[in-house]
Amino acid sequence: MFGKQKNYSAWLLIAAIAAALWLPNLFALGMFIDGIVDAILAQSLYLHIGSFWEPKSQAISWSWGTMPLSIYLLSLFYKILGDHFWVERVYSFLCALLQLGLIYQLWKTLFAYEEAIKKQAWLPCLLWIICPLTGWCYGNNMMENTMTLFTTSAIIASLSFIRTQKNILLSSFLVALFLLLAFITKGPVVLFVFALPALFIGMNENFNWQLALKFSFLQIFSFFLLAVSLFSIPEANNFLHHYFEEQIKPSLGNSSPTDGARYSILLLLTITIFPFVLMSAIRFGINKKTLPNEKMYWRFLLLGLCGSLPIMISNKQRQFYLLPAMVPFVIGFAIYLLPLIDWLNEKIKESWQQKIIPVIKYGSIATILLCMVLCFTQAGTFVRDNDLLSDLQRVNTLTKNETAICADDIFFEQWSLKDYLLRLYRKRVCMSNENVKTPFYFTLPNQTGEHLPAGSKKIMAGKTLDLYQTPQ
């Protein structure tokens, strides 16, 4: 479909898909709750509430269960761009673009001496961006977006040494540094990259098990030294202690806030990579020839499994935890699909290629331009939680500069309402037992509420809540 000299059309297609995934909603409202919470903590840091090692917000005294690096990086964007609701989307969009660049560089590093394959760097980038998990994560401000930048950088640094056998100390230090940065972004799930040297023994004739063992030792030792140096800082050590107690122990124990079957990650992984498996089955049906790089294909698939299967240790099973592991998966599947690209180039006549390529080229350009227009015409619209966000806009108008609103106890677990109100309007929802003076009160629609003060007047009837003004 793409001639050897026409790879630019593939890059245009990738740009068009990226534009379609993220530009129309770049300035829209609505996000998965984890992304909102992370944005609240970053916003609080920007407002000088809490610190790097002591994250908290107006509504949360401390948030020890969240590693701080991505929060800190996002807070820098608030300092640069201002406290706007779209800043976290811009940050995630830039992470997505950087991630595409890193996948491109990973492929170039892997096939540095194979010019024909190196030119197909668009293929893993295309697989990455058409993966539904990718579009969802970068559209919802997930911490995995930042973490994946660091784990991919660590993979590149490790492969660079395996390819050249030069600068083993520098390469080991870089791998360790990137993994430490990934660790303080999301936690220990990043450590799967340490498996890479063992999996790539024999990648070339000079990289034997002795050198792999030495390289692994230097990586782990460097990581240990860097981690000990960092967490010997009292504030960092205090954070790590609380993180272990509030995040690691519950997730490894018998209960956690997001309990699920320990093996559900296998189903989630199957769902995530199913499109690639289907494409691989088509490729196998068309061309059963043995891959020249078959061992490389299996190495990357095993590395992807190293990043996925250990999640079974935890009670917490979420599909977006798989994002860092998807990088080796897309590289592996791209290697397997290379013969399919060659087959398409052979079977599709040059005359047809000359017709198809302009369609892709100009269709992609048109898509990008359309998405740029939608980026602004869709600004301020809702992409999820429409009724709730619409109600909260009215609440903000009616409560003006009020920073707290009292509510029935039933609202205690209305996390989306509380988090949206805090993130978008800096207003905190307080329960009836809190000693907070505020002239406003939430109840469920068409209900008087358990603790609504006598004489209160309903000033807004919404779809998700009613707002009362209480007597002063």
Where are these regions (language model features)?
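Extracytosolic helix-loop segments that constitute the early lumenal/periplasmic catalytic or substrate-binding loops
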Residues: A20, D38-W62, L69-Y72
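Loop-to-helix entry region of an early transmembrane alpha helix in multi-pass inner-membrane enzymes
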Residues: P68, Y72, L81-L98, N140-N141
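Transmembrane-helix motifs of polytopic, lipid-linked glycan transferases
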Residues: V90-E114, S153
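Membrane-interface transmembrane helices that cradle and orient dolichyl/undecaprenyl
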Residues: K108-K118, A154-S172, L337
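Short acidic/glycine- and proline-prone juxtamembrane loop motifs at membrane-interface regions
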Residues: L133-M147
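Transmembrane-lumen/periplasm boundary regions of multi-pass, lipid-linked membrane glycan transferases
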Residues: F178-L181, T185, V190-N293, S308-N315
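Hydrophobic/aromatic-rich transmembrane helices and adjacent perimembrane loops
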Residues: K316-W352
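Short periplasmic/luminal acceptor-recognition loop of GT-C membrane glycosyltransferases, typified by
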Residues: V373-P471
